[in-house]
A protein has these predicted regions:
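N-terminal Rossmann-like dinucleotide-binding module
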Residues: 1-54
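Hydrophobic residues in well-ordered beta-strands that form the structural core
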Residues: 10, 60, 100, 125-127, ...
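Short, Asp-centered acidic motifs that coordinate Mg2+ and/or phosphate
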Residues: 38, 58, 74, 124, ...
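A contiguous active-site-proximal alpha/beta segment in oxidoreductase catalytic domains
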Residues: 105-156
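Acidic-histidine catalytic/liganding microenvironments
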Residues: 31, 69-70, 134
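Structural signature of beta-strand start/N-cap positions in the alpha/beta core
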Residues: 7, 35, 71-74, 97, ...
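Beta-loop-alpha module in the N-terminal Rossmann-like domain of NAD(P)-dependent dehydrogenases
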Residues: 45, 54-117
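Glycine-centered tight turns that cap/initiate beta-strands
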Residues: 33, 55, 71, 148-151
Length: 156
């Protein structure tokens, strides 16, 4: 019996520009184990535009409402760094898995808070930095919230 698809909500998924449009949505859409179920942007009209273009069922102007939606297992954060910590903490507090663009947070302390909360909640989290291969870990199939082992390939 096949495993259920991992349902993804993407924060910062504007059709007008950005990594979500150019990398995350195409990569996730190409993989059979993922299904994008929601997008969020700062304005409802751009969220609706993205959802319609890609055939995504839910669109939100409020990322926190999207995070709480029951049809989401994994949240992908594709917004500016100052918002990573707050959105990441909300995601983890909701019991969702987290995939975030680099850097995970603005400070080491914020990143440690997110790491600790993920451990307490039993959630998987990952930050991806592959400018030459956007959404590289998702596209290559090397990451899944169902995985039991994470490995750091590079650190500074």
């Amino acid at each position: 019996m096949a495993a259920e698809k991992i349902r993804v909500g993407i924060i910062g998924a504007s059709m007008r520009n950005g990594w979500a449009r150019d990398a995350h949505i195409p990569a996730l859409s190409a993989l059979p184990e993922f299904k994008i179920t929601a997008v969020s942007t700062s304005r409802q009209e751009t969220a609706d535009e993205t959802a319609k273009h890609f055939g995504i069922p839910h669109a939100f102007a409020d990322p926190y409402k999207m995070i709480q939606h029951p049809d989401i297992d994994l949240v992908s954060i594709c917004v500016r760094v100052p918002f990573h910590h707050q959105l990441g903490m909300a995601t983890l507090n909701a019991g969702k898995h987290l995939y975030c663009e680099w850097p995970l947070a603005a400070t080491t302390e914020q990143a440690q808070q997110m790491r600790d909360l993920a451990a307490r909640k039993g959630a998987r989290h990952m930050v991806d930095y592959k400018p030459a291969e956007p959404a590289g870990s998702i596209a290559s199939g090397t990451w899944s919230p169902r995985a039991t082992l994470a490995r750091c390939f590079r650190a500074r």
